[in-house]
């Protein structure tokens, strides 16, 4: 059984979700948000870094999935998001976690079955898949979705980052 950490990075709120991959599905372990307040950017990034390290030390996951930066209309927002991602990635790397990155579309596809799902649809599927009785905070829900996507990708025939598969004559070739 593998503990998986999902991170939904943000410069103001970073969501985290921890699930246990049993090999037959995932079980909810924990989720929450790291809130940075309204201080200077370097102070907020330090809070993200320390918060992610604390989650890692508390739950001891062996692998981490994190959302990739999307191109936002506001370049400044995209840069801040990228810096928050970097703080979270460094926290995971320092603890020797296996780290994988996913686009929002990949996460939605893995959890809701369509890359065009909205946040409410993703949250409902997260609740269904993890048998949650209460709605998690939206950033925590996104982080749980990332953890579920990572669990699904890790157990698929085509591991993350190894390219595409081709089929010839009914045989799968990597």
Curated annotation (Swiss-Prot):
GO terms for molecular function: crossover junction DNA endonuclease activity; DNA binding; magnesium ion binding. GO terms for biological process: DNA recombination; DNA repair. It comes from the Bacteria. Mg(2+) 1 binds at residues 8, 139. Keywords: Cytoplasm, DNA damage, DNA recombination, DNA repair, DNA-binding, Endonuclease, Hydrolase, Magnesium, Metal-binding, Nuclease. Its EC number is 3.1.21.10. Mg(2+) 2 binds at residue 67. The active site is at residues 8, 67, 139. PROSITE patterns: RUVC. Its cofactor is Mg(2+). Its main location: cytoplasm. GO terms for cellular component: cytoplasm; Holliday junction resolvase complex. Binds 2 Mg(2+) ion per subunit. The RuvA-RuvB-RuvC complex processes Holliday junction (HJ) DNA during genetic recombination and DNA repair. Endonuclease that resolves HJ intermediates. Cleaves cruciform DNA by making single-stranded nicks across the HJ at symmetrical positions within the homologous arms, yielding a 5'-phosphate and a 3'-hydroxyl group; requires a central core of homology in the junction. The consensus cleavage sequence is 5'-(A/T)TT(C/G)-3'. Cleavage occurs on the 3'-side of the TT dinucleotide at the point of strand exchange. Homodimer which binds Holliday junction (HJ) DNA. The HJ becomes 2-fold symmetrical on binding to RuvC with unstacked arms; it has a different conformation from HJ DNA in complex with RuvA. In the full resolvosome a probable DNA-RuvA(4)-RuvB(12)-RuvC(2) complex forms which resolves the HJ. This is Crossover junction endodeoxyribonuclease RuvC. The lineage of its organism: Bacteria, Pseudomonadati, Pseudomonadota, Gammaproteobacteria, Pseudomonadales. The gene is ruvC.
């Amino acid at each position: 059984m593998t503990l998986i950490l999902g991170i939904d990075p943000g410069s103001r709120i970073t969501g985290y979700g921890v699930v246990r991959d049993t090999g037959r599905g995932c079980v909810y372990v924990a989720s929450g948000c790291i809130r940075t307040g309204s201080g200077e950017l370097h102070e907020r990034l330090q809070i993200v870094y320390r918060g992610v390290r604390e989650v890692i030390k508390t739950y001891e996951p062996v692998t981490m999935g994190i959302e990739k930066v999307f191109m936002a209309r506001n370049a400044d927002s995209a840069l801040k998001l990228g810096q928050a991602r970097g703080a979270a990635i460094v926290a995971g790397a320092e603890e020797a976690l296996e780290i994988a990155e996913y686009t929002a579309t990949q996460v939605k596809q893995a959890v809701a079955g369509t890359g065009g799902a909205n946040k409410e649809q993703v949250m409902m599927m997260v609740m269904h898949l993890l048998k949650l009785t209460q709605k998690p905070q939206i950033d925590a829900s996104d982080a749980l979705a990332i953890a579920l996507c990572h669990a699904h990708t890790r157990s698929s025939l085509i591991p993350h980052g190894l390219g595409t598969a081709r089929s010839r004559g009914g045989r799968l070739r990597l």
